Amino acid sequence: MITVLRVEGFRIVIFSDDHEPAHVHVFGDGEAKINLSGPNDRPELIWAVGMKHADIRKSMRLIERNREALLVRWNEIHG
């Protein structure tokens, strides 16, 4: 598990042994898995457990703002 970003109380990680499609796991009070290239090349929530709806929305905005950098990190980690 590689922490690629810490921001606004969230820890965003990429698992080095994970699978495509490119996605991140967001940890806060719960966990969310977010696809980096969903419909229209926008982040897409795959699932969330134990997160408030407000935190899910906030994490989606954070991923959208940092999407390009996160895709670069995904490719660095997974080749």
Could you say what each language-model-derived stretch is?
Residues 12-16, 36, 71-78:
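Broad hydrophobic/π-residue packing in well-ordered secondary structure
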Residues 1-22:
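Short, charged/polar N-terminal "headpieces" of proteins
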Residues 15-53:
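A short, structured beta-strand/loop element
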Residues 2-4, 42-47, 66:
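Generic preference for hydrophobic/aromatic residues in regular secondary structure cores
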Residues 51-79:
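C-terminal structural segments of small proteins and small subunits
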